[in-house]
Amino acid sequence: MLNAPADKVGTNSDIRHSNAALLSIAHELPPEIVTSDYFDEQLAGTYKRLRMPKGLLERLAGISTRRGWAEGQTFEDGVVAAAEKAIEQAGIDRSQIGLLINASVTRDNFEPAVSVGVHDRLDLPRHALNFDITNACLGFVNAMTVASTMIDAGAIEYALIVAGEDPSPWHRTAVRILNNPDST
């Protein structure tokens, strides 16, 4: 546990960074498009059994399409491709990167952290720290706060924050569970 003098403690909204700036943003979209209609087809038997109307998923979630990685591609491939673009757009040498944070919740393994593989594939310097922050949608904001704080403290010069997701395994599991005759 760490402590700070009471007069130095603020709220999360009080954080101000004086030396950190966003240099680039890049993305890599998965090539496969999966529609809500596809899930309706996969769940047609369940919808019929439970007397649910087709199109329910899109009406409830408001999502008509999602993207997924093609056969043989992984979310980590997308992370690396986007990171390469971001480094190039920022105009810095990767040897200057002192921190890599992966803010994805997707992972193929419990350990090692996704950041370890990304660090290696990007050929970042050995002295660059790397770790994952998995806090769902807030993970990226948390990562920006940690990286900016380390820059302000003078611990690093540049940080690279990455995130890439692949909900396909969760989708397959959900369809399998929902198609179980015992599901209600």
Predicted regions and their residues:
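Conserved "HGTGT" condensation-loop signature of ketosynthase/thiolase-family condensing enzymes
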Residues: 1-98, 120-123
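Acyl-thioester C-C bond-transforming condensing/cleaving domain
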Residues: 2-17, 48, 84, 88-94, ...
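Anionic group-transfer/hydrolysis microenvironments
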Residues: 26, 104, 165
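Short glycine-rich or small-residue beta-strand-to-loop segments that form or flank ligand, phosphate
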Residues: 99-105
